[in-house]
């Protein structure tokens, strides 16, 4: 049996799932995992109950925008269950033998984390559904008239599936998950807690005002907050400062072309395109994405959640529309018979 709490990756392509440079900042236990209070409280109860019964935790489905900690939480779940975890993503399963090798190599009560689970191939999904429900695996040996099906027992394991597109997960697969949780964008207060905790890990002090300014520019996403914190730390180091001040954060954000609302250059390009090319909308997501050189998936997964949360874009049945707040932010005049551009904000 493998060591408890071990973390293994099933492909070198999983770097985006668990960046080693970010590993030192990842919380290892629930106590250090900031935000997502309801998710943590619910999971804590289910984990405790499973441990008291000496059973594997039921399968867990995690959804929400990227960068909110789904992979990190999966590792924490494994830690709390005293179990090993294997981390992979749906595109890594190309053929049935890929999933067979992984499932047969699992330990009792171990955790298998699959990111982008909505991208599973149908034949892989069918095999996984059987494994999740019956803890058995049907394996076809031979071909043609000589083919026969061998049923292999599997250990009682926990599958944690994560996705940014829960609507694309099929009903049969979704029904196999006994626990579901949705991640929401973090509040500024929660991000401040994360930034202050991680600044200590990075051996740099940060002032309260500076932490709030950094949090306000992090799009409600811990991954972005951590990335910005590292870059601001670089600036503080080069300028000879032992403390990150609000002035240093402002310098860093200006260098990175991030404005006071946390919008970067591409965010502003999206708003400008929506207003200037499509008269404020409504316009379909595919058309809007093409106009700014993005895919519809990246627009919906990365940019839209924050722009909608901040009130810059509204989503209607006819498409995306720019709000009055978007016009004000870009210093554009909103008129019923068209638009006059008064002055663009320069960054």
Curated annotation (Swiss-Prot):
**Residues binding DNA:** 315, 320
Name the source organism.
Borreliella burgdorferi (strain ATCC 35210 / DSM 4680 / CIP 102532 / B31)
**Self-association state and partner proteins as the record states:** Homohexamer. Forms an RuvA(8)-RuvB(12)-Holliday junction (HJ) complex. HJ DNA is sandwiched between 2 RuvA tetramers; dsDNA enters through RuvA and exits via RuvB. An RuvB hexamer assembles on each DNA strand where it exits the tetramer. Each RuvB hexamer is contacted by two RuvA subunits (via domain III) on 2 adjacent RuvB subunits; this complex drives branch migration. In the full resolvosome a probable DNA-RuvA(4)-RuvB(12)-RuvC(2) complex forms which resolves the HJ.
Pfam families per the UniProt record, alphabetical = AAA_lid_4, RuvB_C, RuvB_N
Q: Which UniProt keywords apply?
A: ATP-binding, Cytoplasm, DNA damage, DNA recombination, DNA repair, DNA-binding, Hydrolase, Nucleotide-binding
Family affiliation: Belongs to the RuvB family.
Which superkingdom?
Bacteria
Q: What is this protein called?
A: Holliday junction branch migration complex subunit RuvB
Q: Where is this region: Small ATPAse domain (RuvB-S)?
A: 187-257
The text the record gives for the protein's domains is: Has 3 domains, the large (RuvB-L) and small ATPase (RuvB-S) domains and the C-terminal head (RuvB-H) domain. The head domain binds DNA, while the ATPase domains jointly bind ATP, ADP or are empty depending on the state of the subunit in the translocation cycle. During a single DNA translocation step the structure of each domain remains the same, but their relative positions change.
* Catalytic activity annotation: ATP + H2O = ADP + phosphate + H(+)
Lineage per the UniProt record: Bacteria, Pseudomonadati, Spirochaetota, Spirochaetia, Spirochaetales
EC number of this enzyme: 3.6.4.-
Q: Where does ATP bind?
A: 25-26, 67, 70-72, 133-135, 176, 186, 223
Q: Which residues bind Mg(2+)?
A: 71
**A GO CC term?**
cytoplasm
Q: What does this protein do?
A: The RuvA-RuvB-RuvC complex processes Holliday junction (HJ) DNA during genetic recombination and DNA repair, while the RuvA-RuvB complex plays an important role in the rescue of blocked DNA replication forks via replication fork reversal (RFR). RuvA specifically binds to HJ cruciform DNA, conferring on it an open structure. The RuvB hexamer acts as an ATP-dependent pump, pulling dsDNA into and through the RuvAB complex. RuvB forms 2 homohexamers on either side of HJ DNA bound by 1 or 2 RuvA tetramers; 4 subunits per hexamer contact DNA at a time.
For this protein, the record's InterPro entries field holds: AAA+_ATPase, AAA_lid_4, DNA_helicase_Holl-junc_RuvB, P-loop_NTPase, RuvB-like_N, RuvB_C, WH-like_DNA-bd_sf, WH_DNA-bd_sf
Q: Which GO terms describe its molecular function?
A: ATP binding; ATP hydrolysis activity; four-way junction DNA binding; four-way junction helicase activity
Query: Looking at the keywords, is Transcription regulation present?
Result: no
Q: Where is this region: Large ATPase domain (RuvB-L)?
A: 1-186
Gene encoding this chain?
A: ruvB
Gene3D superfamilies membership = 1.10.8.60, P-loop containing nucleotide triphosphate hydrolases, Winged helix-like DNA-binding domain superfamily/Winged helix DNA-binding domain
Q: How would you classify this enzyme at the top EC level?
A: hydrolase
Give the location in the cell: Cytoplasm
Ranges where the record places region Head domain (RuvB-H): 260-347
